[in-house]
């Protein structure tokens, strides 16, 4: 809110304007929806989304798109935020066009976790919105182990968790789950869409495009 909110909005809009493959003549982001902030590696991370329009194919009418990404900064204990960074992209795959969706997810890798004997994982910023009723909390689970969780705020959430676990035997990928206030699971989504299974048995997976 206030001047700081305006500063964050300006940084995010600048990142949106710098998207390399944004179609020429696209309408920039309108009102920005902010997701709960989380802290990791000495920085504060605030995901964001906003609507706009773009001409996806020459000679066609503009269609709605969603801008998505985050603003990140360092918050010293006794001074103003500094070292602002932002990332943005866009998609024309929207939740409003997919009534079967239960969770609207976005994600971006923001770092790497390195363990012993070459073990590693992608530290991933995950944000989204519950599209089912009565959702109270969200969890990120890796191999059925909860690695982050948080209550929802206005049906929105932000998590930071390790994903794409490697060199632990079987690879591990995050599952995002919604829960009601009584601890009943309401929905479950992966960050990945399994396209095919190659002959060697390893699933060929592709990240879902975030949408709202």
Predicted regions and their residues:
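Low-complexity, Pro/Ser/Thr- and charge-rich linker/hinge segments at domain boundaries
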Residues: 196-212
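A general sequence property marking short-to-moderate contiguous segments
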Residues: 12-20, 43-116
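Ser/Thr-rich low-complexity repeats and stalk/linker segments
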Residues: 119-200
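Short, non-transmembrane alpha-helical segments in secretory-pathway proteins
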Residues: 1-32, 136-138
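Generic recognition of long tandem-repeat/solenoid scaffolds
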Residues: 46-48, 83-86, 126, 159-160, ...
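Short amphipathic beta-strand and strand-loop transition segments with alternating hydrophobic
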Residues: 24-41, 110-117
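N-terminal non-globular leader segments, chiefly Sec-dependent signal peptides
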Residues: 1, 9, 40-41, 50-54, ...
């Amino acid at each position: 809110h206030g001047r700081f909110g305006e500063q964050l909005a300006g940084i995010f809009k600048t990142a949106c304007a710098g998207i390399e493959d944004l179609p020429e003549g696209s309408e920039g982001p309108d009102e920005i929806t902010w997701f709960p902030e989380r802290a990791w590696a000495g920085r504060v991370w605030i995901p964001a989304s906003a609507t706009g329009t773009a001409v996806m194919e020459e000679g066609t009418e503009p269609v709605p798109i969603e801008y998505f990404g985050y603003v990140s900064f360092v918050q010293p204990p006794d001074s103003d935020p500094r070292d602002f960074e932002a990332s943005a992209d866009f998609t024309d795959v929207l939740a409003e066009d997919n009534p079967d969706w239960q969770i609207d997810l976005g994600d971006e890798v923001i770092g790497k976790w390195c363990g012993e004997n070459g073990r590693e994982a992608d530290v991933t910023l995950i944000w989204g919105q519950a599209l089912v009723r009565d959702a109270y909390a969200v969890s990120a689970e890796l191999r059925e182990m909860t690695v982050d969780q948080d209550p929802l705020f206005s049906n929105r959430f932000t998590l930071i968790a390790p994903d794409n676990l490697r060199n632990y035997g079987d690879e591990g990928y995050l599952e995002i789950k919604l829960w009601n206030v009584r601890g009943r699971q309401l929905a479950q989504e992966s960050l990945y869409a399994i396209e095919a299974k190659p002959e060697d048995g390893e699933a060929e997976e592709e990240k879902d495009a975030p949408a709202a």
